């Protein structure tokens, strides 16, 4: 299990809150978060409560100025622990929402669905095993989304409207 400590001010100053699991609304514990330390594990922070909106992946390390790092002053309101001891990874991706278009199956990282599968987009997926990060651009760049086992029928319904995913990576021991 991971451990993260949030601080109200930059450079690890002000009130702090220690977290070791998911938190759907961090404003319950503190009014703002300007810096944090990830002591172990990996975490995904979300810009809105209940794990909605833009996401940012944090691994072990120190983040002394969260607003600068996350760009445009984005604040976050919820956090989810991402470290899970999976050995098997399997996901099906679809070109269109609701099982539409071309389908491809992944068991490992994919730095470009266009190059590997000749797919122009990924709008739906079914994660059967493991935990994954999906990226807006090829080569693991741009906005990202954290996926656990389950069906993701429409990214638009998850607050990710207009997002196109072009690469995906397994969450392994990289934390």
Curated annotation (Swiss-Prot):
GO terms for biological process: lens development in camera-type eye; visual perception. The keyword Nuclease does not apply. The keyword Iron-sulfur does not apply. Residues 2-40, 41-86, 89-121, 130-172 form the Beta/gamma crystallin 'Greek key' domain. GO terms for molecular function: structural constituent of eye lens. Keywords: Eye lens protein, Repeat. It comes from the Eukaryota. SUPFAM superfamilies: gamma-Crystallin-like. PANTHER family: BETA/GAMMA CRYSTALLIN, CRYSTALLIN, GAMMA M1-RELATED. Monomer. Has a two-domain beta-structure, folded into four very similar Greek key motifs. Belongs to the beta/gamma-crystallin family. Crystallins are the dominant structural components of the vertebrate eye lens. This is Gamma-crystallin M1. It comes from Chiloscyllium indicum (Slender bamboo shark).
């Amino acid at each position: 299990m991971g451990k993260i400590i949030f601080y109200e001010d930059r450079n690890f100053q002000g009130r702090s809150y220690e977290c070791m699991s998911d938190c759907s609304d961090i404003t319950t514990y503190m009014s703002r978060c300007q810096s944090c330390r990830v002591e172990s594990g990996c975490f995904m922070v979300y810009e809105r409560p209940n794990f909605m909106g833009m996401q940012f992946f944090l691994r072990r390390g120190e983040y002394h100025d969260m607003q600068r790092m996350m760009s445009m002053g984005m604040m976050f309101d919820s956090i989810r622990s991402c470290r899970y001891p999976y050995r098997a990874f399997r996901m099906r991706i679809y070109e269109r929402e609701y099982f539409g278009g071309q389908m491809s199956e992944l068991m490992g990282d994919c730095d470009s669905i266009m190059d590997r599968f000749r797919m122009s987009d990924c709008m739906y997926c079914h994660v059967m095993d493991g935990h994954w990060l999906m990226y807006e651009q090829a080569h693991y760049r741009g906005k990202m989304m954290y996926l656990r086992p389950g069906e993701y029928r429409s990214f638009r319904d998850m607050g990710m409207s207009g997002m196109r995913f072009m690469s995906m990576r397994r969450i392994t021991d990289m934390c």
